[in-house]
A protein has these predicted regions:
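Nucleotide-activated donor-binding/catalytic signature segment of Leloir-type glycosyltransferases, i.e.
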Residues: 1-24
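Residue-level signal for the nucleotide or nucleotide-sugar donor/cofactor binding architecture
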Residues: 18, 48, 86, 100, ...
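Nucleotide-sugar-dependent
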Residues: 19-26, 33-54, 59-72
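CheY-like receiver
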Residues: 26-29, 73, 94-98, 115, ...
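A short, well-ordered alpha-helix in the C-terminal region of glycosyltransferases
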Residues: 90, 97, 104-118
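C-terminal alpha-helical cap of glycosyltransferases
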Residues: 121-138
Length: 138
């Protein structure tokens, strides 16, 4: 259904599955990456593709509830924009706005790359170890 809805669009492409070693190249090729969180799942999930997108230095369009971690990350770091999934016109306007402002899009991509290290496996493991050690001291 999603592919049918975008049929004929020159702005949207659906790519076949790629082997893991090709993923960084695929992520780096996109002008803007969409990360979605279904309403009701905020606070429960953060799609793992977000971290690859940040590492690739690409901007994010977070289509997610305001309370989601994805929206918090995007807003706090300036690596993209957010729109509520229950407001399709807001999503469309976010895309239109970014399409008209390639400099802003490029800035968001740079911010994504700058903050990617905060979310890599090593940083996350260090944070986890710190939390566990602090809990053990209590």
């Amino acid at each position: 259904q999603v592919e049918a809805a975008a049929a004929g669009s020159r702005a949207v492409r659906f790519l076949p599955f790629r082997p893991a070693e090709q993923v960084p190249y695929v992520l780096a090729a996109g002008d803007l990456h969409v990360v979605t969180v279904k309403p009701g799942l905020e606070g429960v999930v953060v799609p793992s593709k977000l971290y690859g997108i940040l590492a690739a230095g690409r901007p994010v369009l977070a289509i997610a509830p305001e309370e989601s971690d994805v929206v918090r990350i995007v807003r706090r770091t300036g690596c993209g924009v957010a729109a509520d999934p229950r407001e399709p016109e807001a999503v469309a306007e976010a895309v239109r706005s970014l399409a008209r402002d390639p400099e802003r899009l490029a800035h968001m991509g740079r911010r994504a790359r700058e903050i990617a290290h905060e979310y890599d496996r090593v940083s996350q493991l260090e944070k986890f170890v710190q939390v566990v050690e602090e809990a053990g001291r209590r």
